[in-house]
């Protein structure tokens, strides 16, 4: 049983719902049901439970934050919606995500205790219901207060949490106490769990009060060292309750919906009808009865024709989807998400395509950027960071819409080919996995597949939760398997290795004691200056000298708290002293590459925009690479500016500072740009700052070895820029002497090219231009001569009758000449079949005959190839007479 002091002191009664069997607390002796959907209908639509007037989400949010500030809670800024501090999920799904796993595990203290926040959150688990149910959103603000109770420091727990909720809803919002129900439940999310109260008013859940004290490990609950108050008050839901509008969308997005309706020429929906439909929809489980079936049931309940109800609802549904999804996508892009085929970008693209699909189904042709821009103006006050990203958001939306339109053009061909493939496999149509494959491979929404399949006489059943399934598949990050050289059990008793490479990155040699040798090749020292592979920087190599012998160090890896050296040759004995010598030239070159990487990625960000985030990196010699999130290939001018900016930082000889800071302090000071290089799993963070404290050029959490100043880099040279995936651009670059060698090689090639062109470097462009002009003139003459020769060749072409066709066989090595001969000959003679052999190729041209039977006959004698209806080409290594006989058999 879950109870609280305020419930007992104010006379709440504990009851059990006869429908869902949940226990709940209420002041009403006559209350029979739990007060939650679907056990009871909404009772607030058109009938709000409070007289207090709150005119905006902004006002409601501020009331909540101030309420808890007055009660000793520190207000903290909202976190990004992209969870860059986590390695398990892409998006923040609740305010507690901000503090998982570091704070909830006890590894890091919270930024304040207790605290209050209003956190934008994104959940796509119910994306298919958005626009239809009247209450579901993909993006919402979770207003929350949190308290973290330690064994030696108690803040507050169940009694105070329930009391705060009771006071907020009754005193701050003016809701009568008898309208409030506290329903007992269990909450689980983000790897943690605990008992909870769901706070309900007139059938709507407006808050969840979770008392988290479990970690979920392999499906089992394990006690946490902390007891955490994890609350969630739905900003949008509470505002809907207060306004009593037909749907949550009308409350949250009212002004935008009005403008969008006028712009698109949509009629105002009958509010009474929408309200009734929302009430009934809330009581149904669409996952059980089906979304389309739900329309039929609702139509029957309110006494209207189902077809008419759909006609009224569909435009509104498209608008509601537009309003919700456009805000969510704008949040994501403003936080650096680029729509793509993977990661968080996949989820952003899914939402954009769902908008476009719904608008197309109701005949909207208005460019999506216009509808987005209209919404961005409404969001400007509450989310200034979204408005700052306006140009980027609109550009990406435009790109995505153009891609979508191209996808729709390809639909008939793609669907037909997929259907033919399904039939070859003995299947009559498309199943759910086929629809997923068509979406992921070609971007085709299932509704478009179904529409196209109708023309083939195929009926397609679309799962009601199709988009939710897609989102679930892509919601979590894939964990990379850890590289383990030795079993932890073999080194668990050893002390932590002292990391000399951090204490002095310029240390070239050192002395150490051998603590353990495993399998004759894995060596653990008490201290080491050999850098262990990590953060995209390769491990150091070198030598371990011992006694009269030496062993090559070929790899260095972290295994838990110790550093393991992989050696070749005679391993030093345990207990002996060794002298380690690092391959310094290689290490120093890698330090230049690593510091150069930080300089370059910040330069890319400053030129291309703040949406740039590192998507991967590898420091190596003679060249390194950085992969960044970007939606198009940078122009030559942009690349030149990036290179210029990076080298200006090198020339400025900025200091490079390394600081060890508590995680919270580092995040508060620098923000989540710290995690440009990825998640750092530590209580304290090693921060690498380029530039002075008052105006740093770049700041990142990093475990690599770095230079003392940027001047040591010498030179940064970008060698190549390419798109390696949708939404990802790769920069290949080099630094220092390797950069100089690269430039010198380019100079050598330029000089050689100039010499070959008959000039020098100063007039190379003019020389090449003259050569190209001559080459073009020669090409024109060659084409003319080919045409003349082909025409003469055709005059002498001999063909023999075979069936109703005429067969000519010629031997030609020149493929261009063969094409021209075939073009002239088959153009004049529609019954001609021309067989061309030569150059290792066999080609068949026809004036009109179907080449299919000919190809079939040729394959029987060893021909490998294919083509179109009147053309086929391939290879054949057998006797030419056998080839000719096969063609004759096909034509006879």
UniProtKB/Swiss-Prot annotation:
Signal peptide: none
MF annotations from Gene Ontology: alanine-tRNA ligase activity; aminoacyl-tRNA deacylase activity; ATP binding; tRNA binding; zinc ion binding
Cofactor(s) for this UniProt protein: Zn(2+)
Segments traversing the membrane: none
Subcellular location: Cytoplasm
Any single Gene Ontology cellular-component annotation: cytoplasm
Name this protein carries in UniProt: Alanine--tRNA ligase
Species for this entry: Pyrobaculum aerophilum (strain ATCC 51768 / DSM 7523 / JCM 9630 / CIP 104966 / NBRC 100827 / IM2)
Lineage of source species: Archaea, Thermoproteota, Thermoprotei, Thermoproteales, Thermoproteaceae
